[in-house]
Amino acid sequence: ERSQFLHQVLSRVARDFRRCATSDTTVLGTSEKNTNLSARVNEVMTEFADDTRANMRNFLDDETQAELKEGAKEALGHNLANFMHGDLFRDIFASNTTPVLTGNSETALAQTRARVGECLVALVSHHAGSSGVTRELHAALLEFINDVLDTAVLNTRFLVQRLVKAETVVTFTTNHYYSQTIAKFDQIVRDNANGWRHNHHAHYDGVDDGEDEGLSRDFMHSVAHDFHIGSNEASAIRQMQVSLHAYSKVVQKRFVDTVSVLVLNELVYAIADKLSDDALLWATLLLDKVKEDESVDRERKKLGADQQRLQQALRLLGKF
């Protein structure tokens, strides 16, 4: 009976957790927000995306230009002034991107673990209770669940760290945004270069044409000014800045989407599978946690003693 009771409790928790993960808002009533797990995790991932976008380095700023200029200068004598240096590109990108990707993904992972934990606490409290005969079961089951979640977090963190390393070591994309942004920049330069070179009034045409690609007016004004001065080195630096800008947007979107899918799978759907798959095993391990309330135990023993005395009396009466 105890084993059957435990299996029923665990099966109900597993069933309802999967409902929570798939946008069922009626699991414990519409007023219980912790069990609206898909919505809670979506909030975490939306914040993760917003924070990553806000925290990424603006590679079109003057500081980046200065770093690139200094790095390119050190390579002169072997590379030409208009040459885009791959190692310099990767070094500046990685040093500015790694802390953002690492910190924001760790926050998203911790917050998702918290939301999943809150959902499971609500379900366990509902199905197993937290007093009387199920008091120890409630505590032991939550301990099991916390161990499973902690292990899942460790495994997921390892996978996310591998992703961070890949994004900061490997420079690769087939995303059209990267080539589209660079093509737009080149088009603006081609269309306006002649006017920029001969402009003596510091008012340049075309500097607003790249705003849809994130190429700000201030940046394009600086590009136009460089053409007026006539520096090949400056043009190469600006080209590299645009490449860094476009590639950072690609990585930001790619990383956020990949981490979000990974965390959802490992901390939500994989946990739902584990709860279902391990219900029988956990029921066996938790058998000793289902105990009677002390008052119930005393009453049961008293009734048993009374029953024994009654049976003894009946046997004595049967002798007459």
Model-derived features: where do they sit?
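Extended, charged coiled-coil "stalk/tether" helices of large eukaryotic trafficking and scaffold proteins
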Residues: 1-320
